[in-house]
């Protein structure tokens, strides 16, 4: 069968799993980033004109949103992602963001998911980066897939029987806009409102 468009075939797709503390960026149409989130946040950023995008995945060390020492971990994750996009040819004023995660997964983590979500929204607002979609909070884990070239995102909520990576705050600093499709795991149906937050 001959393809009538320039979309990559399944055999050409490269899926990179983005773990907590990671930051990745690409301009390849064959690249897909995937991650699973509980209390963590992932930020998907894209310059749709330059055709470059990237993802980070972070968890603040505590729920204290006034603790500057802790907030710098989230700021560092954001700055790494923005700088990676700029190196690939993005223009800062064109960068768009979509943010996901921040669920209340366990009592042991307390309100850290809520704090992560609040940090991400405040950071984007303060830096003048347009947030075109978000799905934050709730008590279910999320599986995210992101196409950095176009900014397309898919989200699927996971059930209690799914294995979610154990999330632990990381204290070590590293040196150095398409559509959103939402799926519910149990009926695999596309959710009608891509901006609606879970209850």
Swiss-Prot record:
Stated role: Probably deamidates glutamine residues to glutamate on methyl-accepting chemotaxis receptors (MCPs), playing an important role in chemotaxis.
Name of the gene: cheD
Name recorded for this polypeptide: Probable chemoreceptor glutamine deamidase CheD
UniProt catalytic activity: L-glutaminyl-[protein] + H2O = L-glutamyl-[protein] + NH4(+)
Keyword Hydrolase: yes
GO biological process: one example: chemotaxis
InterPro entries referenced in this protein's UniProt entry, alphabetically: CheD-like_sf (IPR038592), Chemorcpt_Glu_NH3ase_CheD (IPR005659), Cytotoxic_necrot_fac-like_cat (IPR011324)
Key words, A-Z: Chemotaxis, Hydrolase
MF terms in GO: protein-glutamine glutaminase activity
Keyword Protein biosynthesis attributed: no
UniProt xrefs under CDD domains: CheD
Organism: Cereibacter sphaeroides (Rhodobacter sphaeroides)
Source lineage: Bacteria, Pseudomonadati, Pseudomonadota, Alphaproteobacteria, Rhodobacterales
EC number: 3.5.1.44
Family classification: Belongs to the CheD family.
Gene3D superfamilies in UniProt: 3.30.1330.200
UniProt-listed Pfam families: CheD
